Amino acid sequence: MSQQPANIMKYKINLFGITRDIVGDNVTEIEMSQSADVQTVLSELKTNYPKLKEIKSLLVAVNSEYAESNLVLSENDEIALIPPVSGG
């Protein structure tokens, strides 16, 4: 059984609405070389999926609570991208 190096952090992000449509799946994972905050993970996602940059009011929830951009994440955190709600 192989293990990843200790300094690699793997984050699982749950996707909803338009973010799910852009990525093409309900969940995506990214790996970072060190622990990261919400803003860093969001920036990496926007690099990997440039259409996410078009969403102006994208919110991030960590462990079922809206998160500030400077919140440092743990690998076991439940991360969700929440797009703006539309409709009537």
Language-model segments: what does each one mean?
Residues 2-86:
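Ubiquitin-like/PB1-type beta-grasp interaction modules and other compact soluble beta-rich domains
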